[in-house]
């Protein structure tokens, strides 16, 4: 019996609804943070934001359509 687990890629979101920044963080910050959120791997995209691979669908990622960054809560 096989089981299919949905996974997604995307930018991690901070509590403010913005992409999780990585500019002034150690080089392994994104990979470690993605791993903590059950993602397979991640990296700091253009030294600006953490991008993760193979995360569970339950993890919220930044999406242009639902962007609330800088718009209050």
Swiss-Prot record:
It is found in: Secreted. The modification Lysine amide is found at residue 71. Residues 8-70 form the LCN-type CS-alpha/beta domain. The keyword Signal applies. Disulfide bonds join 18-69, 22-44, 30-50, 34-52. GO terms for cellular component: extracellular region. Expressed by the venom gland. Pfam families: Toxin_3. CDD domains: neurotoxins_LC_scorpion. One of its GO terms (molecular function) is sodium channel inhibitor activity. The keyword Signal applies. Keywords: Amidation, Disulfide bond, Ion channel impairing toxin, Neurotoxin, Secreted, Signal, Toxin, Voltage-gated sodium channel impairing toxin. Residues 1-7 form the signal peptide. Has the structural arrangement of an alpha-helix connected to antiparallel beta-sheets by disulfide bonds (CS-alpha/beta). Negative results: does not affect the cardiac Nav1.5/SCN5A, the peripheral nerve channel Nav1.7/SCN9A, and the voltage-dependent potassium channel Kv1.5/KCNA5. Beta toxins bind voltage-independently at site-4 of sodium channels (Nav) and shift the voltage of activation toward more negative potentials thereby affecting sodium channel activation and promoting spontaneous and repetitive firing. Belongs to the long (4 C-C) scorpion toxin superfamily. Sodium channel inhibitor family. Beta subfamily. This is Toxin Td3.
């Amino acid at each position: 019996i096989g089981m299919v687990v949905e996974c997604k890629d995307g930018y991690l979101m901070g509590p403010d609804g913005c992409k999780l920044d990585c500019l002034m963080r150690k080089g392994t910050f994104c990979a470690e943070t993605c791993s903590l959120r059950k993602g397979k791997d991640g990296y700091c995209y253009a030294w600006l934001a953490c991008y993760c691979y193979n995360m569970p669908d339950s993890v919220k990622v930044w999406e242009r359509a639902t962007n609330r960054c800088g718009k209050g809560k």
